Structure formats: C-alpha cells, structure tokens
C-alpha cells in the first residue's frame, strides 16, 4: 500500500506533466479501503477543448515516461477529462459519478500556495 507521501509524489508528477485545473483521487485510497492490490485512481480535469482518445493517450504516455524517469513505482489509472466531459458522464450515470461524489480533491490550480491539499 502507498503512503500519503508516495501518493502526493505521483499527484505532483501528474500536475507537472498535465498542468490540470483539478485532480481528484477516487477509489479505495480516497475511501480509506486500500489493500495490497490497490492502485491509485485519479480523475484529472483540464479545461479547454474536449480530449479525444488520442489526446488522453499522449498525456498518459507522458505521465508514464516521467514516472519511469523518476523511478516512481506507483500503479495507477489516470483519466484526463474536461469539466464538460465529466459533467456529461455524470449526467448519464457514467464512470465519474463515484469520483465526483466521493473522491478527494488533491490538487486545484486556484489554491494560491502550492495547489496541493492534504489527503
């Protein structure tokens, strides 16, 4: 299982690569139920034009390469969407309803100090 410091190290890496507006931790780590097989689930919200599958794949590849470069061994699922895409998914009972209702905001661009929150 990952310590809070390891989670925030990975969140920092994602924020550096993607330059998002907000990052939400969801799944077992956000809900306090992680086990040895748990990975980190992050919903990364970056406003602008909607992300295509190719756009998301390019950013996910950049996160993967930066993670390897820094020898960070975190297992993860990162979903990169716009606010509009998340809202549409939530309205249709999609994958991000749970993240929006129960997830923890761990990064937000508008935070004046560092953008990061404690988890």
Regions found by a protein language model. Give the residues of each.
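Conserved H-loop
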Residues: 28
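Catalytic core of pol beta-like nucleotidyltransferases
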Residues: 1-22, 31-36, 46-119
């Amino acid at each position: 299982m990952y310590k809070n410091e390891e989670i925030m190290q990975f969140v920092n890496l994602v924020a550096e690569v993607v330059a998002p507006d907000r990052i939400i931790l969801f799944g077992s780590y956000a809900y306090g139920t992680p086990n040895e097989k748990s990975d980190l689930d992050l919903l990364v919200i970056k406003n602008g034009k909607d992300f295509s599958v190719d756009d998301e794949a390019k950013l996910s590849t950049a996160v993967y390469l930066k993670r390897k470069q820094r020898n960070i061994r975190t297992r993860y699922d990162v979903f990169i969407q716009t606010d509009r895409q998340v809202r549409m998914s939530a309205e249709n009972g999609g994958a991000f309803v749970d993240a929006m209702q129960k997830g923890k905001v761990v990064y937000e661009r508008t935070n004046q100090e560092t953008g990061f929150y404690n988890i």
